[in-house]
Amino acid sequence: MAHFTELDSNNIVLAVKLGCNIDIQNNGGEQSEQAATHFESVVPLSEQGVKYVQTSYNHNFRKQYAGINFFYDSTKDKFICPQPHPSWSLDSNDDWQPPITYPTIIDDGADPRIWIWSYNWNEDVYQSDNTKGWKGKKLNTDRRVHTDTATYDWNGTAWVAE
């Protein structure tokens, strides 16, 4: 199945809709304007929609499979994810990166693992202290609550108890 994104006037994805591969082949082929125009004749745009652009479910073209609120960069011919947090910036591959690198220590290092780090980005923490942002807790691999219930901060090289 072919997938088309419906874009608004700012190239923001409003919807992703299914099309027919045979229609693509008979109307200009993959990624063609002709195929998108034909799709529009079969599936009219919504009130906010201005055009269709094909996206690849298998990530074969236009960087990645687009979703609602993705941005289509027509100059680079790719879909870019929404910015996850205000402090994150795009890298040279158009992937969002946090101002503090992702944690590299993700478990206890034992074999077999006994616990892993469960972590997430906290924008409020970062805005109040730009040396912090990742918050983590220990989580047992068997889903039992870990005896260490403290919350930790990632400092870029290690987890530090609050």
Regions found by a protein language model. Give the residues of each.
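Viral virion structural and adsorption modules
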Residues: 1-162
